C-alpha cells in the first residue's frame, strides 16, 4: 500500500513537472522572442530605407550617435536615388543566436534591394542582396539593437 502511494506521488510529481516545463517552454534567454523579431524587422526596414529617425525606438541609447552619423552622411544625390527606386528594401530574418547569458543575441538578416552608403563623399549604390549580423541586448526588459558601428554587410560564401 505504501509502495502504491509513493508510486502514485512520483507519477503526480512527474506530471506536474512535465506540465510546468511544457508551459514555460525551453526558453533559455530573456525577453520576448516575438518582440525581438518584430523589432528587428521594423528597425531593418526603416534603417535600410534610410528612415533613420524611426529606428531610434528600436535601438539602445548608446546607438543614437551611430544613427546620427549615418543621417549626417546623407546627401541630395542619395535622396534623389532613394526617390527613384522602384521598390523599398525588404528583409528576411535568417537566424537568431542567443548568447549563453541570454541577455544578448546576434540576428542574421538578408536585406534585398537597398541603397548602400559608400565612402564619405561618394554616392550610394544599389545592392540587390546582402547579409548582415545585428547585435541585440536587453534594455529595460526589452530587446534593442545595440549598434557598435554602422551595419556592414557580411561576405557571402559562394562555394
Residue ranges and their predicted role:
Residues 1-24:
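Sec-dependent bacterial lipoprotein signal peptides
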Residues 8, 32-33, 82-85, 120-124:
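Intrinsically disordered, low-complexity segments enriched in polar/charged residues with Gly/Pro
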Residues 21-49, 57:
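Short, low-complexity N-terminal intrinsically disordered segments enriched in polar/charged residues
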Residues 37, 52-106, 110-114:
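Short solvent-exposed beta->alpha transition segments
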Residues 49-50, 143:
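Tryptophan-centered motif/residue detector
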Residues 98-159:
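Exposed beta-sheet edge and beta->alpha loop/turn motif
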